[in-house]
Amino acid sequence: MKFKVIIIILMFVAGPALAAENDALKINAFGTLGLVHSDNDKADFVTTVVQSRGAGYTRDWSGVVDSRLGVQLTYLPTDKLSAVLQVIAEQRDDGVIRPEVEWAYLQYAITPSLSVRIGRTVLPTYLHSQYRKVSYANHWVRPPAEFYVVPVNNSDGISILFNRHFGELNYALHGVFGQGDQDQAGDLRTEAKNTLAVANTFEYGAATLRFAYSQTQLTSKEINELFDVYRLFGSQGSAIADRYNLDDKRLRIFTVGGSYDPGAWFVMSEWSKTKIESFFGNSIAWYVSGGYRLGSVTPYLTYAQTRSAGDGSKQQLDAGSAPPFLAGLANNLNGVLAAMTRPVDQKTITMGVRWDFASNAAFKVQYDHINLDDNSSGVLTNVQPDFKLGDSVNLLSLVVDFTF
């Protein structure tokens, strides 16, 4: 792994030198400078499972939730072969902003309609997966948190891209097979293997329709070590560990999405169902968003919702039947399990305005009202003991997005 990182760094450093000698090398950059404020200081609002610091508990105003800087190198030595390297610096699992590789692949065009990629790519799980971190390309400050919070976003392996025109209808197939891993907040590391993703996209004029399916097998050593403690309580504890641990558990995500953008206005929506036999639990999420372009100013609205889709039953250790010296531990473990399997049900209403004040820069202001369902802490993190379940959270975000 260290050798791979060294090679990537050498490629990154050598890029400018190659650019002086070869016009086939293109360098692009993008970024976001953002601030977000939360009125609830008992939990943090974050945008990914990677982030350990957010707005609310850590700081009422946070500059690390949305801020990032990315650089992409594209090398085209021939009309069939290309290489892409994208590095993004943003907040990582330890709360520090540092660069990591988002894309790193070679692509070969077998035919004008069929290409193969080998290397690291972003999974095509959702409508905006491929460019969700290029905030300038999106009308909102960030994608709905209810929808885009997933354990693994990248895959190291092989991708197949196919497109075909049928008159005015364009069809695109994007398939991925590989593996990967992800460091997450709380000193957790999730390993994904046998990752498979298939996305089908249909475009007709201003309309886009997309169907996608992805699955992977997830393992987390840290999570499994925690649930191994439950096995001290015999068959009851082993049943809990087997149900909720993360030991080669299959995660499946089904998504349907679409958009319509005739120019002056736009609307988009997505629906997804996530299934996994683990503490994550099953869930259903959806959103609808739209806006109207008034010259350089674009006001927009978004409504998003996520809810648990399991059977609602939860197992607990019977502390009363445990030996006296283990009764206290059983109660503590029940508390941990209750927190880990707590519903994430929430609804968010978003209002915002985008102002394109330059050809390559935009200012956005956005207000989010998050309404948590009863007994839910939503997708918030760093939830404190005195956090009120079912409470609401109000966010105010100010960002500047740019590309060059």
Which role does the model predict for each range below?
Residues 110-113, 151-295:
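Signature for the C-terminal beta-barrel architecture of outer-membrane proteins
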Residues 2-8:
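Sec-dependent signal peptide recognition
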Residues 40-42, 58, 107, 228-404:
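Outer-membrane beta-barrel pore domains
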Residues 38-42, 94-97, 125-130, 171, ...:
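Outer-membrane beta-barrel proteins
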Residues 10-12:
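Short, linear, compositionally biased motifs with a strong N-terminal bias
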Residues 21-38, 58-182, 192-196, 200-211, ...:
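Outer membrane beta-barrel
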Residues 47-55, 385:
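A solvent-exposed, charged loop/short amphipathic helix patch at secondary-structure junctions
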Residues 14-16:
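N-terminal signal peptide c-region/cleavage motif recognized by signal peptidases
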